């Protein structure tokens, strides 16, 4: 897929303008298995409108952590791309380090920026110190994926019977195991940025960070850990890698998958012959979560070029992919939601009615909360500490959740800046 995308970019760019007239910019993005098909759709339309710009694709990032680490290394080496796609929770570190460039000078030159769908709530996701540094490209939320053919083995045959709470999920797992389903459920604990741990915290309306205060030491934090333990034990959940998880569900091996809506396009394209339904993310009560963290990524200008032509070309590409027309391909090819208002209200007016599985996340939009980054220079290290601790629950290394809570809080607080 990656070779195909690069070939399309080069072929289209070469055929539409003389090489001497072209401005070449470099671009990097994460998750090739999700986004290659999206950029394959976007590039031809972009080149048709902008034949004087060539977009050179760099190797894709494996994750948002990889994306941030790669940019930090490239900044030191003087090898930055012009535009990078970064996790919404990883923009701040690039702003703090002076790597991301403010988009305010470019926005000021746009006559109809708001009319083009760039509303304030969208801009807020990429605003730091009262300036816009990133334009959100794709927004995701956690949802439930269900193989209804397998769910029928637990007596669940319609959407309104699907579990609404994690206790109900655990009960369904027991029924499915009794019915011979080997892997009843997979829960996305290992999705980038401790996203699902934050989801359990926001479910209780509790952010994981309050300033520099790590709030896993609260009753809500202990509830989050105990909820994961109950799910993993009740469902005999194996410890799978990310790509193996999606492949396994698409093959029909699991009855329930709790994951990002971002993977829906991939699952729909690759799934076996079974009835797939998505449904709202369960909560601790039947009322559902109070909030959920917004996942996704934003386009950030990190070019170290001083050439006005390069910077203008980079802005042209950055604006196009986040525009109504460009961002609409996000919804068509993935399960992400485009934050651009024009994409949702104009380009995709009837799309969600015709694609009910993709509408699930849209119904959860009122729950959107911040996907928090951990402050200071050790933010990525904090992510790893929590990843390791959660994996220990999956593997059975940790059984006493209060003891694990104390251990994680002590280790994380030592990595965070002091003061509120």
Predicted regions mapped to residue ranges:
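Extracytoplasmic/periplasmic substrate-recognition and gating elements
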Residues: 21, 48-49, 54, 154, ...
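Short, polar/charged alpha-helical segment
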Residues: 33-54, 386
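Extracytoplasmic/periplasmic solute-binding protein
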Residues: 128-137, 142, 152, 167-213, ...
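Glycine-centered hinge/linker elements that transmit conformational signals in sensory
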Residues: 170-176, 211-239
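Long, aromatic- and glycine/proline-rich binding clefts that accommodate carbohydrate-like moieties
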Residues: 279, 332-388, 392
């Amino acid at each position: 897929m990656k070779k195909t995308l690069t070939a399309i970019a080069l072929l289209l760019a070469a055929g539409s303008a003389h090489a001497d007239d072209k401005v070449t910019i470099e671009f990097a993005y994460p998750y090739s298995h999700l986004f290659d098909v999206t950029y394959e759709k976007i590039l031809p339309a972009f080149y048709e409108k902008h034949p004087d710009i060539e977009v050179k694709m760099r190797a894709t990032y494996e994750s948002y952590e990889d994306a941030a680490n790669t940019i930090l290394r490239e900044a030191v080496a003087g090898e930055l791309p012009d535009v990078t796609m970064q996790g919404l929770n990883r923009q701040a570190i690039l702003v703090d380090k002076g790597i991301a460039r403010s988009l305010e000078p470019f926005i000021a030159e746009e006559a109809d920026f708001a009319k083009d769908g760039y509303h304030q709530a969208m801009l807020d996701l990429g605003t730091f110190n009262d300036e816009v540094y990133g334009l959100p490209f794709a927004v995701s939320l956690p949802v439930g994926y269900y193989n209804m053919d397998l769910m029928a083995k637990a007596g669940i045959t319609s959407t309104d019977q699907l579990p609404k709470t994690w206790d109900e999920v655990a009960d369904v797992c027991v029924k499915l195991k009794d019915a011979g389903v080997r892997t009843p459920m997979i829960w996305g604990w290992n999705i980038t940025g401790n996203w699902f741990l934050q989801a359990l915290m926001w479910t209780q309306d509790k952010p994981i960070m309050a300033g520099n205060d790590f709030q896993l030491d609260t009753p809500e934090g202990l509830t989050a850990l105990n909820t994961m333990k109950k799910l993993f034990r009740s469902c005999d959940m194996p410890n799978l890698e990310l790509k193996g998880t999606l492949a396994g569900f698409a093959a029909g091996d699991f009855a329930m998958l709790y994951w990002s809506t971002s993977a829906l396009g991939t699952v729909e394209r690759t799934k076996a012959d079974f009835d797939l339904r998505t449904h709202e993310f369960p909560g601790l009560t039947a009322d559902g979560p109070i909030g959920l963290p917004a996942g996704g990524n934003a386009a950030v200008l990190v070019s170290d070029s001083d050439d006005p032509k390069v910077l203008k070309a980079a802005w042209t590409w950055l604006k196009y992919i986040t525009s109504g027309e460009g961002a609409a391909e996000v919804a068509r090819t993935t399960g992400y939601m485009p934050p651009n208002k024009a994409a949702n209200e104009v380009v995709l007016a009837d799309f969600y009615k015709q694609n009910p599985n993709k509408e699930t996340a849209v119904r959860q939009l009122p729950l959107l909360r911040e996907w928090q980054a951990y402050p200071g220079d050790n933010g990525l290290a904090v992510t790893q500490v929590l990843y390791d601790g959660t994996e220990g629950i999956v593997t059975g290394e940790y059984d006493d959740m209060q003891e694990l809570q104390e251990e994680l809080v002590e280790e994380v607080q030592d990595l965070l800046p002091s003061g509120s």
